[in-house]
Amino acid sequence: VDQETLFNRHVRFVGDRVAAVLADTPEIAAAAAEKIKLEIEELPAVFTVEDAMKEGAPQLHEDGNTVTLPECGFGGRYADVQGEEFIHRSQTQRVSHIAMETHCAVADYNPGTDRMTVWSPTQSTFGVRSCVAALLGMPMSHVRAIKTPMGGSFGCKQEMILEPLAAVGAKMTCRPVKLQLDRRETILCTVLRHPIKSEIRANSTKAYSQSARPDR
């Protein structure tokens, strides 16, 4: 299935999802997953922001490596820059949210009524509903998303990660499907807080009035 919501033929990182196994027990599914064989062509990699922005850099996505180029600030090109310049650079690492509860989703499809029900500890109940409906080509009125009690999130459960795959599996098999990640899988295969490199330039006069502050 060449559908990036589920899988993608262009693997970009360790933890990228390439296949799924549905079985009667977690043990059978794990054993079957070990037997999957992949043929992967190694592509040029990019590991830093600076390398990704270089001319001729390997393109991780078809539409380029840059997500957006927002512009904001005051002073600088909008006013006369005066006084001493102060430059502050900072860097943060990639951070996992480490919610007490790992990611989990359950889906059940009723072929008689063409109704899908998805249970998950999500922060985006209506996002799950619209995503599953669009993916399966079902009316939104036929999809019900139920938010279960959440064992922590801190933002990591805003995205639809397991819910679409569980729903597809349930519709394919007409049986309930449960997907649950352990701690290692949650760190490798779900969303993390992005590492950030920032630079702030400020110009101040002797009277400590700030005249320019372009950020990036």
Regions found by a protein language model. Give the residues of each.
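Extended, polar/acidic
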Residues: 1-131
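Glycine-rich and small/hydrophobic secondary-structure elements
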Residues: 2-29, 154-206
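Short, solvent-exposed amphipathic alpha-helical segments in soluble enzyme
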Residues: 36-38, 132-138, 195-196
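Short beta-strand elements
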Residues: 104-109, 197-206, 210-216
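Proline/glycine-anchored alpha-helix kink/cap motifs
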Residues: 105-111, 130-142, 165-180, 202
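Helix-loop-helix module between adjacent transmembrane segments
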Residues: 114-116, 151-157
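Beta-strand segments within the central parallel beta-sheet cores of soluble alpha/beta enzyme folds
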Residues: 141-148, 175-184, 211-215
